[in-house]
Amino acid sequence: AIANQVAVTNDVSATAGVTYAGMNNAHAKFGDRSSDIVANVMTGAVYHKLIGQNLTNTSQLFQAGNVRVIDILGKAVVVTDAPALYVAGTPNKEYVLGLAAGAAIVHDAGELISNIDTVNGKERIETTMQVDYSFGLGLKGYTWDEVNGGKSPSNAAIGTGSNWDKVASDIKHTAGVVLIGDAAK
């Protein structure tokens, strides 16, 4: 959903990879609300690319008395190799999300159906259990588009940005920003 909004997307993949400056420019898309961004989400490869950029600048890396580890641009960092953060193509693209507080909320919808089935007459008694449940997902500033995404969507449908409609009156009241960089740079 975030990458479908040009106003909060910093796509430098045509000329550059992920850098601190690129992340800062993505955060700047929130303007005076950039302090609402509380966490950056990235792959392990991107995280280590950024740490490598810091290591080449050793004179500034330890200039402060308190060294904060895993803190990029004053934001917490979530490192996960989630497939959605890397898109193969020409060029291969790496995504870094800058998320606002409450960007995504997952909640139990309270619908739990379970069935236990026991089968006799075989060499051993067989008992199986199957449980189905439902949950809800909310993205800050967006609503689910049932016409495009369906009433009971698959994981692929949930991950398709065009299935989420922006309802926030101001882009700064949405889930966050995204930086897209060339994975080879």
Report residues per predicted region.
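Structured, hydrophobic secondary-structure cores that serve as assembly/anchoring elements
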Residues: 2, 20-52
